[in-house]
Amino acid sequence: MVPASGSASANAFYSPGVDNGDYVYISGQGPRRPDGSLPGSFSAQVSQTLDNVKTIVEAAGLTMEHVVYTQVYLEDIGKYDEMNSIFGEYFPKAPPARAVLGVARAPQSSIEISAVAVRSLADRRSIYPPNYQHSDSCSPGVLTHDRMFVSSMSGSDPSTGKVPDDPAAQVDLALDRLQAVLKAAGLEMGNMVFVNPYLTSEMPAHVM
């Protein structure tokens, strides 16, 4: 699927989006404008990246409200707050589930975003566990007619934001937070079919 306008273009190895009927899968989009130029500021790059995602979503006949999951890659994780404030502007009604990852290098510039959109909004709902601090930019989970999308869950204490020194305690906290989202949707850990753990060098794989 290729939008009629925008910076996304297909080649032998890449499609901007794939429409399989119930879902539209949007490939990682960078911040280049349709003419190939790159915005100068980071905030402008975030906006252009989301505009590029939006162009593909709309080419499928959908809106940003149909987006249920996004994955954001940042070269400088220190710019998270700046990205986050702009991100929320694109999802004013029902923000998607989301993972934000710090990476050593993105292909085009400092940010890349991939996404999944659902075609029917009939059964789409955001999932919030009890006492969860609401966010304007993402939902802990999004439930559709046939699957659940869960945001990345960090190994920090949800009430204080503190990250334990013990790696095993971080794993427990992340899994507890994941379980709380599933439970709020009426699901259990046994219902999960895919999980993607992200570790830093400070987290031994055998502990996770």
Role assignments for model-derived ranges:
Residues 1-51, 55-69, 74-194, 199-208:
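N-terminal presequence-like segments and the immediate start of the first folded domain
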